[in-house]
Amino acid sequence: QKVAVRLKEVVYTLSPHQQN
């Protein structure tokens, strides 16, 4: 579960559709 959250966080951070 923690790994999934970490992965999601990383993916979100790497995602270009971030706030900035």
From Swiss-Prot:
Domain of life the protein comes from: Eukaryota
Subcellular location per the Swiss-Prot or TrEMBL entry: Mitochondrion inner membrane
GO cellular component: mitochondrial inner membrane; respiratory chain complex
InterPro entries on file: Cyt_b-c1_8-plants
Topology relative to the membrane: Single-pass membrane protein
Keywords: Electron transport, Membrane, Mitochondrion, Mitochondrion inner membrane, Respiratory chain, Transport
Main location: mitochondrion
One Pfam family it belongs to: Cyt_b-c1_8
Keyword Membrane: yes
Subunit structure: Component of the ubiquinol-cytochrome c oxidoreductase (cytochrome b-c1 complex, complex III, CIII), a multisubunit enzyme composed of 3 respiratory subunits cytochrome b, cytochrome c1 and Rieske protein, 2 core protein subunits, and additional low-molecular weight protein subunits. The complex exists as an obligatory dimer and forms supercomplexes (SCs) in the inner mitochondrial membrane with cytochrome c oxidase (complex IV, CIV).
Family, as annotated: Belongs to the UQCRQ/QCR8 family.
Protein function: Component of the ubiquinol-cytochrome c oxidoreductase, a multisubunit transmembrane complex that is part of the mitochondrial electron transport chain which drives oxidative phosphorylation.
Name assigned to this protein: Cytochrome b-c1 complex subunit 8
Gene designation per UniProt: QCR8
